[in-house]
Curated annotation (Swiss-Prot):
The keyword Protein biosynthesis applies. It catalyses: tRNA(Asx) + L-aspartate + ATP = L-aspartyl-tRNA(Asx) + AMP + diphosphate. The record marks 31, 82 as: Important for tRNA non-discrimination. Pfam families: GAD, tRNA-synt_2, tRNA_anti-codon. HAMAP family: Asp_tRNA_synth_type1. Homodimer. One of its GO terms (molecular function) is ATP binding. It is an enzyme of class 6 (ligase). This is Aspartate--tRNA(Asp/Asn) ligase. Belongs to the class-II aminoacyl-tRNA synthetase family. Type 1 subfamily. Residues 198-201 are annotated as: Aspartate. The keyword Nucleotidyltransferase does not apply. L-aspartate binds at residues 174, 220, 450, 490.
């Protein structure tokens, strides 16, 4: 081997030993005739000292520059008093260099790798192989590796089998657009890249494998956000003969074990909350429990007011009026309130009413708001008591369709929590349960809230009689307002699966065409089964404190789903297209 140690392995116990390092020159400094090189490898940094007494190695050190690849042999010694570096794992020692061999030179990188600099993301992605040399980036990928090792070990110890499922499969309606792959051997037909291994893992349960997992690549052709990529990694889990409580306990144990092993953090039992309670109190099905702000329903106090902005929604069963108290918010300037009004407009809110509570004991005179004149004092007092308002607070109101109010005030709650630094702890894991089975579309049709294979908490007859009121056996794990993973007990009887398909508007012919293999499998003794899938990229992002999942993926795509380093996607030559039976047609130019 070319090296005896990694840089990060050097410590006081090696004092006096001769070692060999291989790595990159992270930083070079010339101090009073002595040359210091900080050498970097994947494990960390080590300081190597070259003095003029060893003329050959000193001359070599004098020639090297940042990012040269070098091999260095020398002796470990303690640093002089006052020269230790607590920011380096090897900061108590240094290496007195004897030999230096340049293994490869380097041009000057397009951005500095040894200091923080505000480099545009596109430049970083164009030179990702250099960006990943930066210690903070390398540390994120090292932590990701430790995480997957911990997860695999936990699942292996709990009897799970690691089974690979196909990447080339067929398109199924799972919500997002599929990435399609044309078949050369079946003209006019296309494979689809999997959005998840959902159906294959269910078929593995039918096959009797009982406990399955996979660190799976998944693909979705959707609009990208900070937590989305066209290809992403999923911790995919499925089990037989376990109910919701069992699966949630098993996977919660995995996450608690992961945080203990990787970050040395102990979590207690995760609280459970129904979907209905989460939406009512927090305006979100993935609430951030670090934030103490809550939404409070107040429509009952506004039904009779002479103010249609409130009385209209208060008397409409499809609408909601909610209040959000912000402690100490009465000092907010008008511009800040206007900014928050614009913010909720993103979510469809037509405005943002508010009351500043200056002095409650003074009655209406102690309240500052354009709306107080429209609300009887008795009702105002009930509202302020209900939200717990005291002097110095501000209370915001949302009145509109229930979905708009929940989303707008839920998003405002999160923004206020961060803007005003209200978060009460660093980590807040939880479970959300009892989701609706379906969501109703504007045209009266239904869509599956999770996916069409989720089991309901009722019989097929009850489901078809009242689909809007049906609850599912689904569960989501949420951490700090981010959905870590979602799962459910699956449908394991053909009759129930067909009933769900019918409610989703999938007729028998389409059922047979797209899901015939699944319906066939359910006829042959499919066991009760369920599972869960975690977004690995999102989990790594949270555990490293990264701002985007692009920071924790080795070679991510941009927000326009492109790879600026390899220039993918790229143009394909005409011969390859002919072999795939594809002809490109130019889009006519607009007149």
């Amino acid at each position: 081997m070319m090296r005896s140690h990694y840089c990060g392995q050097l410590n006081e116990s090696l004092e006096g030993q001769e070692i060999t390092l291989c790595g990159w020159v992270h930083r070079r400094r010339d101090h009073g005739g002595v040359i210091f090189l900080d050498i970097r490898d994947r494990d960390g940094l080590a300081q190597v000292v070259f003095d003029p007494d060893r003329a050959e190695s000193f001359a070599a050190a004098d020639r090297v520059r940042s990012e040269y690849v070098v091999k260095i042999t020398g002796k470990v010694r303690l640093r002089p008093a006052g020269a230790t570096n607590a920011n380096m794992a090897s900061g108590m020692i240094e290496v007195l260099g004897y030999e230096l061999e340049v293994l490869n030179e380097s041009e000057t990188p397009p951005f500095p790798l040894n200091e923080f600099s505000d480099v545009g993301e596109e430049t970083r992605l164009r030179y990702r192989f250099l960006d990943l040399r930066r210690p903070e980036m390398a540390e994120k990928l090292r932590l990701r590796s430790r995480m997957t090792t911990s997860i695999r070990r936990y699942l292996d110890e709990n009897g799970f089998l690691d089974v690979e499922t196909p990447i080339l499969t067929r398109a199924t309606p799972e919500g997002a657009r599929d990435y399609l792959v044309p078949s050369r051997t079946h003209a006019g037909s296309f494979f689809a890249l999997p959005q998840s291994p959902q159906l294959f893992k269910q078929l593995l349960m039918v096959a009797g494998f009982d406990r399955y997992y996979q660190i799976a690549k998944c693909f979705r052709d959707e609009d990208l956000r900070a937590d989305r990529q066209p290809e992403f990694t999923q911790i995919d889990i499925e089990t037989s003969f376990l109910d919701e409580k069992d699966i949630m306990g098993l996977t919660e144990g995995m996450i608690r074990n992961l945080f203990k092993e990787v970050l040395d953090l102990e979590f207690g039992e995760f609280p459970h909350m129904t979907f209905e309670e989460a939406m009512r109190r927090y305006g979100s099905d993935k609430p951030d429990l670090r934030n103490p702000l809550e939404l409070v329903d107040v429509a009952d106090q506004l039904k009779e007011v002479d103010f249609k902005v409130f009385s209209g929604p208060a008397n409409d069963p499809k609408c909601r009026i909610a209040a959000l108290r912000v402690p100490g918010g009465a000092s907010m300037p008008r511009k800040q309130i206007d900014d928050y009004t614009k913010f909720v407009g993103i979510y469809g809110a037509k405005g943002l009413a508010y009351i500043k509570v200056n002095e409650r004991a003074a009655g209406v005179e102690g309240l500052q708001s354009p709306i107080v004149k429209n609300i009887p004092e008795a009702n105002l007092n009930v509202i302020l008591d209900r939200v717990g308002a005291v002097d110095g607070d501000i209370v915001f109101f949302g009145a509109d369709k229930a979905k708009i109010v929940s989303e707008a005030l839920g998003a405002l709650r999160i923004k206020l929590g961060h803007d005003l630094k209200l978060l009460t702890c660093e980590w807040a894991p939880m479970w959300v349960v009892d989701f609706p089975m379906f969501e109703e579309n504007d045209d009266g049709s239904f869509s599956a809230l999770h996916h069409p294979f989720t089991a309901p908490k009722c019989s097929p007859e009850e489901l078809e009689a009242n689909p809007a009121g049906a609850l599912s056996r689904a569960y989501d794990m949420v951490l700090n307002g981010t959905e870590l993973g979602g799962g459910s007990i699956r449908i394991h009887r053909k009759e129930m699966q067909q009933a769900v398909f019918r409610l989703l508007g999938i007729n028998e012919a389409e059922q047979e065409e797209k899901f015939g293999f699944l319906l066939d499998a359910l006829k042959y003794g499919a066991p009760p089964h369920g599972g869960l899938a975690f977004g690995l990229d999102r989990l790594v992002m949270l555990m490293t404190g990264a701002q985007s999942i692009r920071e924790v993926i080795a070679f991510p795509k941009t927000q326009s789903a492109a790879d600026v380093m390899t220039q993918a996607p790229g143009v394909v030559d005409a011969k390859a297209l002919r072999e795939l039976h594809i002809r490109l047609r130019e889009t006519p130019k607009a007149e």
